[in-house]
Amino acid sequence: FDSSFTGDDRLRVRLQAAEGNFLTPFGGLANAGDTGDNFEVEVDDFYYSFPLGSRIDITVAATGLQGDDWVTSTIVPYDGAGVADASGPAFYDAGGSSSNGAGAGISFALTDNFVIDAGYTAGYEGAGDPAVGIFAANTQSYIAQLSFLSDGFLDAAFAYMHNDNSIAWQGGNPGATDTFAGLVNLDFGNFFVAGYGAWQDFDGGDDFNWTAGVGFNDLFLEGSQFGVYGGQLPQYVGNDRNPWLVEGYYQIPFNEFLTITPAIIYGDANFTDGTDDDTFYGAIRATFSF
């Protein structure tokens, strides 16, 4: 639910109900989650954003924002179009907060093409407890990203992130994670080539993860997108090596209200226990907009 007081601001309250997930060794499906048995409804997003002059936007969140939620663009066109959560650059989740807590962010358009974004998230539990507060929460993260957005051939960005969630990485050591990442998209009109690479340093080791993809816009149908991307995902606890995933998808707009996206996904989770983790998946997503 979006509402506005001035026409330039936004108050968003997003409710979500979900049960189970899919592709959990690879981050699940995009925008999926588990709110418990019987499709319990929870507040997934609750934030307010407003402009400060002509070049600055401020966002204050009670819950729901972390990682790439604070940036103007994630650069790669297959983020959001793909069905798997890995379609979004995975370093944003791996380097962000372990949960979507309270936080604040700023977006500053330095010029018409250069934008710098910064955001801070205090993960639950703690952020929602007045006795603890957002600056004393157990898990905290912050991000800064400089983006070049052109409306033309080249879009690119460099991001730095820091969090207190080293325990999620292979080895399970408590401590911090520092992330350095680059993203790029080359737009040839209706054809694009894009990808990202991220080096993440945690307590006890480091990790390099990446994806790359190609795609066609308006293939056979106006407003459609066909794409294939794949790469090496972050190596968390329980993985012997970095998981691999490849997805092919075709986003089809049936009308102004309905978009259908079928996808074929191949993943190799590389579990430490040696179980069968090399699998093909099929998925289809329906998106209704009103």
Say what each PLM segment does.
Residues 278-290:
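Outer-membrane beta-barrel "beta-signal"
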Residues 34-36, 92-94, 132-134, 146, ...:
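Outer-membrane beta-barrel proteins
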Residues 112-113, 137-141, 147-248:
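Detector for outer-membrane/organellar transmembrane beta-barrel domains
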Residues 103, 263, 283-285:
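Terminal short linear interaction segments
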Residues 20-22, 67-68, 125-126, 165-167, ...:
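Flexible loop/turn segments at secondary-structure boundaries
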